[in-house]
Design a protein with these regions (language model features):
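A short, surface-exposed loop/turn module that caps and links secondary-structure elements
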Residues: 34-60
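Enriched for short, Lys/Arg-rich terminal
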Residues: 1-7, 12, 16, 20, ...
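Short amphipathic alpha-helical/adjacent loop interface patches that line ligand
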Residues: 18, 22, 33, 52
Length: 94
């Protein structure tokens, strides 16, 4: 297995949100999060207009879930900030 270009890390809040998902959905969402380590700017990624350095990608069954993350190119790091349903994920973004 070849090493991935970027390292994935999660905020404590993002980990809690991921753990709260149904097991089936969590597996689907996590497998798509893992792909961000290979390409943090995949097709369909969008930069959030209101927050500097934050991106979002649609994931999971029906693409109804969002992963909000920061890309730190200088450290080759993807920091997952929020994970959740598209209706809830943008609340309380700091």
């Amino acid at each position: 297995m070849t090493p991935r270009p970027y390292r994935l890390t999660f905020t404590p809040g993002a980990l809690r949100e991921l753990e709260r998902l149904d097991a089936f959905i969590r597996r689907k969402v996590f497998s798509e999060i893992e792909r961000l380590a290979d390409n943090p700017r995949p097709h369909g990624v969008e930069k959030l207009e209101t927050k500097d350095k934050l991106y979002r990608v649609h994931v999971g069954p029906g693409k109804n879930y969002r992963v909000v993350y920061e890309i730190r190119d200088e450290n080759l790091l993807v920091l997952v900030v929020r994970v959740g349903d598209r209706k809830e994920v943008y609340r309380r973004l700091s």
